[in-house]
């Protein structure tokens, strides 16, 4: 049976996005799914701080936050079993280090239906 939105209701999802309008869209989609939002954060230092303080059930991360990439933080999330979805305005997969190319990702601007489906699929796994 495929996961349903009920499977992620109450999950604490960390949002890292430095573009305010996109962050609001991400937050809206996740709230509609019944998730609790951590953030959104707009830089890597805040991402690390919020991750350590709240131990999220999932993370939706822009790969580039105010000119700094999030790739150094990803191993910590993955090691602790936190499901991650990468968001990016870049379609070129070669911009993502090889170790992280298999992570679920969605391109910006995103389709809200596709984002909802991806969030349910990925965040229901934990």
Segments predicted by a language model, with ranges:
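Conserved acidic carboxylate
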Residues: 17
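Active-site residues of response regulator receiver
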Residues: 62
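Alpha4 helix (beta4-alpha4-beta5 surface) of REC/receiver domains from two-component response regulators
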Residues: 72, 79, 90-108, 113, ...
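Two-component/phosphorelay signaling modules centered on CheY-like receiver
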Residues: 20-39
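Acidic, metal-coordinating helix/loop segments flanking the phosphotransfer/catalytic sites
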Residues: 40-58
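The feature encodes the CheY-like receiver
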Residues: 66
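Non-catalytic signal-transmission and effector/linker regions of two-component phosphorelay proteins
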Residues: 1-12, 107, 111-126
């Amino acid at each position: 049976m495929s996961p349903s939105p009920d499977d992620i209701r109450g999950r604490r999802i960390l949002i890292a996005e430095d573009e305010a309008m996109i962050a609001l869209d991400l937050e809206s989609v996740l709230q509609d799914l019944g998730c609790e939002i951590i953030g959104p954060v707009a830089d890597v230092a805040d991402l690390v701080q919020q991750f350590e303080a709240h131990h999220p059930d999932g993370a939706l991360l822009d790969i580039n936050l105010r000119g700094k990439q999030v790739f150094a933080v990803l191993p910590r999330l993955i090691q602790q079993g936190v499901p991650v979805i990468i968001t990016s305005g870049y379609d070129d997969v070669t911009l993502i280090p090889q170790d992280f190319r298999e992570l679920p990702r969605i391109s910006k601007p995103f389709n809200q239906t596709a984002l909802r489906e991806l969030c349910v699929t990925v965040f229901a796994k934990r």
